[in-house]
Amino acid sequence: QCETPYFARRRKLIAAVLDVCLHGKSADLSPVEDGLWCICEETTWAISAHANLTAAHPFPISSEPILDLFAAQTAMVLSFTLTLLDDWLDSSLHQRVTAEIQRRAIDPFLHRNTDWWMGFTRKDLCNWTPWIVSNVMFSARCLTDDPLPVYRRACGMLDAYLRCIPADGGCDEGAAYWNMAAGSLLDCLELMAEAGLNCWDEPKLRNMLRFPLLMSLGNGYFANFADCDARPVMYGERLQRAGELLRDAPLTAMGQNLRGQPTDCIGDVPHFSRLLQ
């Protein structure tokens, strides 16, 4: 009941942004403005399942922002919106959105050590780490003059995540989780490549990026285990990019074959950065 309108609001915003990008002055900017303002007015950007609500404390606290998967992803969506429509948006709206991204995503990322997925208090990490880190990195890249403080802190978190991954690069949650595990790690590494990082020959990384290729049974079917479907939605554009960076022709071909429509990236979980790739 909570997640349906939550994700619908973000899908509508992305669609409205694309409408303005495609049609320019003939497009209606008000759905973008309304979407941005409504999201800024939300008490929390975390979904209810991640908000740590209890009978004693049934409401989120706005002064204690929760940085979960979708709070980070919301920050990314808003950051791309501000970047794409920088000249179109009123300066006061731009300032409000920027301040909310800073308060809810970038500041907690830089100054808090208690979130389990950061790897400071817990060692058994999962796709939460690269998923959140990648979206905060996108936000910092779009909105800050110097994203390097975020990138440096991201390196420590990603190192902790990589220590949890076996040498064979396997994902114990199944092939579908590659999208937001190794696929999100790929997002991080491409951003860091702007600062000179080159790690594409690292054996564990290569194995992680090639994992779906090993799980493929053909015709869109994958060996399924944990809670992974036998025919999962795979982000073909990320697989293709991984294949190109690794100079791996079979992986590149798999990505090309699995590329869907742009609207697939705003389906269940709106992902603006993947939509633009």
Role assignments for model-derived ranges:
Residues S26-I66, Q73, G169-Y177:
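Helix-terminus loop motifs that line ligand-binding clefts
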Residues F7-L22, D34-C38, A72-L84:
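Non-membrane alpha-helical segments in proteins
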Residues P58-A176, D187, H271-L276:
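Active-site lining segments of carbohydrate-active enzymes
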Residues V20-E33, T81-Q102, A140-C155, M192-L205, ...:
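Structural helix-adjacent loops and short alpha-helical linkers that scaffold large soluble proteins
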Residues L18, C38-E41, W45, F80-L84, ...:
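Positions within ordered alpha-helical repeat solenoids
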Residues A15-A16, V20, V136-M137, W178-M192:
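Alpha-helical scaffold elements that line and support the substrate/ligand-binding pocket
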Residues A182-Q277:
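Carbohydrate-active enzyme catalytic cores, enriched for enzymes
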Residues R10, I14, S30, L69-A72, ...:
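Alpha-solenoid HEAT/ARM repeat scaffold
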